[in-house]
Regions:
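Gly/Pro-rich turn-and-neighbor structural signature
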Residues: 23-25, 107-114, 182, 189-190, ...
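Structured mid-domain segments that build the active-site/substrate or prosthetic-cofactor binding neighborhood
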Residues: 170, 175-178, 185-188, 193, ...
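An acidic-aromatic substrate-binding cleft motif
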Residues: 96-154, 160-180, 352-355
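Contiguous, structured surface segment used for ligand recognition
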Residues: 1-123
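Hydrophobic faces of well-ordered beta-strands that scaffold small-molecule active sites
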Residues: 129-133, 176-179, 205-208, 256-258, ...
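Conserved, mostly hydrophobic/aromatic
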Residues: 15, 78, 131, 173, ...
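The substrate-binding groove and active-site-proximal loops of carbohydrate-active enzymes
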Residues: 73-76, 134-159, 175-185, 220-238, ...
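Hydrophobic or amphipathic alpha-helical targeting/insertion segments
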Residues: 68-105, 188-215, 219-247
Length: 380
């Protein structure tokens, strides 16, 4: 898997940084002192003489252990688990996940040892873990297209920049990313190479509460949409807009946002009352899941999906909107660090589980908190 090879290349770079030498890669198990592989995909791992039961049938789990022959075994339950296990070795030799972004140059070493009894087993407690590049207007966007990855296309955040972001996420064992979506930034899928580099680093791409079905509505409707972004009076064109993107990305790792708001962080068009909005959202959810069934997986319950009741949508949810059981409910703060709705016992028992959409900083009218860290760490 590509993400495993990505992690191995990072490890090799890290080893060279710490020990001033490189790892020699060999397919011959007798010569290699480090064995890397994924359960069920590598005979070397399956026959390494290490108990793999603690990570079997788990998502993104890894195990580091010293075998009876003195070899270090790095095993993963799946491709991301294996990659995280490789990156754990980088941490053990002293390389910070922030080594590039924070200029955290690792200390030089001549030797590194693990005891014969060494065993390190880890797995995530949260299935989808990631960040949202937002309010990027005077930060990431100008730095990317003007400085780090110069481009003639104003506002373009390209694959070179995303590679640095995704490397950090991989090193931190994060697996999910919502791309920048303000009007100052070129939409993620408009730039060649962006979706490919996400796959290279094992990243699920998703979209925010006002960007359903992998569409940057704010940046893409004006180019690809027809008429008003209104599911009451223009549903055929809106559905076609979503369908184009689902067809394009169907084979990739995605976390599909369901539902609908306005073009950019406003209430939906065409429905004024709570009951009208509930009726529209009920149809939207059905039609969106029909697209996922048609293009992604005939068993739509196996497709990663999330519904985000942000701002006015929470009122619609409280009015009785029914969200399919396997769809994750992502609860939101009030923009200032206080969660508006904590899941009930019934919501906690849902197959899709629950998530959190949280503002570390907030930009919005009539005031914003971009320059001062006003969300106390105890809230986070």
């Amino acid at each position: 898997e590509e993400v495993v090879h990505t992690a191995l290349n990072l490890l090799n770079r890290d080893v060279e940084s710490v020990f001033s030498t490189r790892i020699i890669v060999t397919p011959e198990s007798k010569k290699g002192m480090i064995i890397v592989g994924t359960i069920g995909q590598s005979d070397l791992i399956d026959k390494a003489g290490v108990d793999l039961s603690p990570i079997k049938n788990k998502k993104e789990a890894f195990l580091l252990a010293v075998s009876s022959t003195g070899k270090l075994v790095i095993a993963g339950s799946d491709k991301r688990g294996t990659a995280y296990g490789v990156m754990e070795l980088s941490r053990l030799i002293g390389v910070s996940p922030w080594e590039w972004w924070a200029d955290a140059t690792p200390a030089k070493k001549e030797i590194f040892q693990l005891p014969a009894s060494y065993r390190n087993v880890q797995s995530p407690s949260v299935e989808y873990r990631g960040i949202f590049i937002n309010d990027e207007d005077w930060g990431l966007t100008p730095w990317s297209w003007q400085t780090y990855e110069p481009s003639d296309v104003k506002g373009q955040i390209g694959p070179k920049t995303h590679e640095r972001i995704f490397e950090l996420l991989l090193r931190l064992r994060a697996n999910t990313f919502w791309p920048a979506m303000h009007g100052c930034s070129v939409p993620f899928y408009f730039t060649p190479g962006n979706k490919e580099v996400a796959d290279k680093f094992g990243i699920f791409i998703g979209t925010s509460h006002c960007e359903p079905m992998m569409r940057n509505t704010n940046g893409e409707w004006k180019r690809d949409g027809v008429g008003e972004y209104d599911y009451v009076h223009n549903s055929a064109h809106v559905l076609s807009f979503w369908e184009q993107r689902v067809k394009e990305v169907a084979g990739l790792d995605n976390l599909y946002t369901l539902g609908m708001r306005g073009v950019h962080d406003g209430a939906m068009n065409g429905a004024k009352t709570i009951e009208e909005q509930k009726a529209v959202l009920t149809k939207v959810l059905k039609d969106q899941r029909d697209l996922l069934t048609k293009y992604v997986n005939k068993d739509v319950t196996q497709v990663p999906q999330v519904f985000i009741p942000y701002k006015e949508v929470l009122d619609v949810y409280h009015a009785g909107l029914q969200v399919p059981d396997e769809v994750t409910l992502m609860w939101c703060d009030d923009n200032y660090g206080y969660i508006r709705h904590f899941p009930t016992a019934e919501e906690r028992a849902r197959k899709g589980g629950n998530g959190v959409y949280y503002h570390i900083s907030y930009w919005g009218r009539p005031h914003d908190y971009l320059w001062l860290g006003t969300a106390h760490p105890s809230l986070v």
